[in-house]
Amino acid sequence: MPLDRNNNPNQQPVELNRTSLYLGLLLVFVVGILFSSYFFN
């Protein structure tokens, strides 16, 4: 597992950055909807 991570150090950060951005947006959206539901209830 550690070898795999050190094998593609150039492709890891790019994918991680994109995934992080998408995940962050999705997380914010889900959290917002959850909070809205709680507040509306």
UniProtKB/Swiss-Prot annotation:
Which GO terms of type biological process are on file?
photosynthesis
Membrane-spanning intervals of the chain:
20-40
The principal localisation class reads membrane
Highest taxon in the source lineage: Bacteria
Query: Which Pfam families has this protein been placed in?
Result: PsbL
Record carries keyword Cell membrane = no
Disulfide pairs?
none
UniProt-listed SUPFAM superfamilies: Photosystem II reaction center protein L, PsbL
Q: Where in the cell is it found?
A: Cellular thylakoid membrane
Q: How does it sit in the membrane?
A: Single-pass membrane protein
Keywords annotated in UniProt:
Membrane, Photosynthesis, Photosystem II, Reaction center, Thylakoid, Transmembrane, Transmembrane helix
A single GO CC term for this protein reads: plasma membrane-derived thylakoid membrane
Instruction: State what this protein does.
Output: One of the components of the core complex of photosystem II (PSII). PSII is a light-driven water:plastoquinone oxidoreductase that uses light energy to abstract electrons from H(2)O, generating O(2) and a proton gradient subsequently used for ATP formation. It consists of a core antenna complex that captures photons, and an electron transfer chain that converts photonic excitation into a charge separation. This subunit is found at the monomer-monomer interface and is required for correct PSII assembly and/or dimerization.
Its family remark reads:
Belongs to the PsbL family.
Q: How does it assemble?
A: PSII is composed of 1 copy each of membrane proteins PsbA, PsbB, PsbC, PsbD, PsbE, PsbF, PsbH, PsbI, PsbJ, PsbK, PsbL, PsbM, PsbT, PsbX, PsbY, PsbZ, Psb30/Ycf12, peripheral proteins PsbO, CyanoQ (PsbQ), PsbU, PsbV and a large number of cofactors. It forms dimeric complexes.
- Name-wise, this protein is Photosystem II reaction center protein L
Q: What is the lineage of its organism?
A: Bacteria, Bacillati, Cyanobacteriota, Cyanophyceae, Oscillatoriophycideae
